[in-house]
C-alpha cells in the first residue's frame, strides 16, 4: 500500500499524519461546552474518517493532534488555544549554548521562526502551525504553549509561551 513517509529522528521514518479538515462531533462538543461542561475530545488527534454517501468510514492513520486541537478551538469559537507539551516555555536553539526562551511573541515572529526552521516537524512545529492558524482566523485570539506542570502559573501569565 502506498503511503507518504517522512524522516523522524535518526534513521526512523514514520507515516505522516493527515491534517484535520473538520471535527465530526463538533456540534455535540459545542453543546456541552456551552452548558459549562469540560469536554475531553479529539484525543491523540482522532481517527480519520471519510464520508461516503451518508456513512463515515475509518481511514488508516492518526490525525495530527496539535492541528486537531487548533481546528476544534476554531470550530467552537474559542478565544484561546492552550497546547500542553513537555516544556515550560518554547525555546529557540533548544539545548544549545545560545538557547533563548520565548515569552510573548507575535504571529509574525512565530511565522518567522517556523520559516527559519527553529522547530522540529514532530515536536514544536505542529504546535506553532496550530497556534498561528487558530489566531489568524479571528481577531483577538491567542495561544499558550506550556507544560501541564506549569499550566496554573502560565494561566496567571507567570510562565509559558504566548502567541498573539
Q: What label would you give each PLM region?
A:
Residues 2-13:
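Single conserved hydrophobic/aromatic residue that forms the stacking wall/gate
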Residues 15-28, 33-145, 149-164:
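Active-site phosphate/oxyanion-binding loops
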Amino acid at each position: 500500500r502506498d503511503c507518504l513517509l517522512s524522516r523522524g529522528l535518526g534513521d526512523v521514518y514514520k507515516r505522516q499524519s493527515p491534517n484535520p479538515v473538520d471535527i465530526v462531533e463538533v456540534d455535540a462538543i459545542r453543546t456541552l461546552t456551552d452548558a459549562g461542561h469540560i469536554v475531553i475530545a479529539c484525543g491523540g488527534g482522532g481517527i480519520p474518517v471519510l464520508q461516503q454517501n451518508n456513512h463515515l468510514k475509518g481511514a488508516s492513520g492518526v490525525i495530527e493532534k496539535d492541528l486537531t486541537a487548533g481546528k476544534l478551538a476554531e470550530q467552537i469559537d474559542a478565544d484561546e488555544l492552550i497546547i500542553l507539551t513537555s516544556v515550560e516555555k518554547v525555546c529557540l536553539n533548544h539545548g544549545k549554548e545560545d538557547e533563548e526562551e520565548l515569552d510573548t511573541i507575535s504571529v509574525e515572529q512565530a511565522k518567522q521562526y517556523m520559516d527559519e526552521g527553529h522547530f522540529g516537524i514532530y515536536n514544536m512545529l505542529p504546535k506553532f502551525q496550530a497556534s498561528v492558524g487558530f489566531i489568524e482566523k479571528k481577531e483577538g485570539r491567542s495561544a499558550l504553549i506550556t507544560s501541564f506542570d506549569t499550566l496554573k502559573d502560565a494561566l496567571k501569565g507567570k510562565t509559558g509561551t504566548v502567541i498573539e
